[in-house]
């Protein structure tokens, strides 16, 4: 009985440790999506990235580890607009309040488009 309880406790601790590392949120801001050109390694949370990196949206439409930015580009790194009232930047251009940053497949560039 004691061995099974000990085994259960160990599994529970490992599960909690693994989950908390994925949910751990590091300080700093994600850079703008179009500046994160590395699409690998993919990540789910900041805990998967090395010491000074965050898990951020990238140019490929997924998330990968990137160096944090001193600028606040919104909670999503300027990715496809932001639900809050913060400005969204697209290719270094500030989008209007009714626009979002979206990848244009024809020009292969990000551009501001209406929401």
From Swiss-Prot:
Pfam families to which the protein is assigned, alphabetical: WAP
Q: Which cysteines does the record link by disulfide bonds?
A: 30-56, 39-60, 43-55, 49-65
Broad class of where this protein is predominantly found: secreted
User: Sorted alphabetically, which SUPFAM superfamilies does this protein's record hold?
Assistant: Elafin-like
- GO biological processes: defense response to bacterium; defense response to fungus; killing of cells of another organism
State the name under which the record lists this protein: Waprin-like protein
Where is this protein found?
Secreted
Q: Name one GO molecular function term.
A: serine-type endopeptidase inhibitor activity
Domain of life per record: Eukaryota
What GO CC terms are in its UniProt record?
Answer: extracellular region
Extent of the signal sequence: 1-21
Instruction: State which tissues express it.
Output: Expressed by the venom gland.
* Key words of the record: Antibiotic, Antimicrobial, Disulfide bond, Fungicide, Protease inhibitor, Secreted, Serine protease inhibitor, Signal
Gene3D superfamilies documented for this protein:
Elafin-like
Q: Which InterPro entries match?
A: Elafin-like_sf (IPR036645), WAP_dom (IPR008197)
Which purpose does this protein serve, as stated in its record? Antimicrobial peptides with activity against Gram-positive and Gram-negative bacteria as well as fungi. Recognizes carbohydrates in the microbial cell walls, and induces structural damage to them. Also inhibits microbial serine proteases, as well as mammalian elastases. Carbohydrates that are recognized are LPS, mannan, peptidoglycan, and N-acetl-D-glucosamine.
Q: Which residues form the WAP domain?
A: 23-69
